[in-house]
Amino acid sequence: NITHIVNSIAAFEIHEWTSFDSPFDEYLNGDKQALTLKQINGMNLFYGKANCSSCHSGSLLSDQKFHSIGIPQFGPGRTRPFDPYARDVGRMVETDNINDMYKFKTPALRNVSLTAPYGHNGAYPTLKSIIKHHLNPIKMNKNWKLEYANLPKAPWLEEIDFVTFSDKREQDRIISSINIHPVELNDKEIDQLVSFLE
């Protein structure tokens, strides 16, 4: 049955593509030379001041829960079947619970430097930009530029790709759903976080 097939594929992917031999793992296993000082400072920020580990925790660096961080919305996403509006309401598509609106699953950060672009829809091209978004989601959402989107050339889709992004009421709903708090880091600290995650 389909459940067995899906579980088999998932087990294969976890076995083949999950890395637990990174410098971070070596550091945790006692090799204090595995990380540079910059990476150690980034790790300390990750688990401390930056509060990343409140959501990015466990062996996969994900709590496997759903959160709204106000990623700028573009593209059709996964709208609800009866919703004529091309928008992605996140977890609410599955639960029909308004409290899940615009919540997306916390991604695992294993090998995160290989998984750009970032955000559930690829809104940010670099680790630095998605970290900055997490630090101040309202400001970053409001300052997001259309050219950040890395979309395939599909003229027949261009008309709907930015309908949600251009809708002020929808943007206000996304921003009001944010459930993470701003954190203030300087550029040096952001670079340390990036170094740790890479």
Protein language model annotation of sequence segments:
Residues 1-198:
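Periplasmic c-type cytochrome electron-transfer domains
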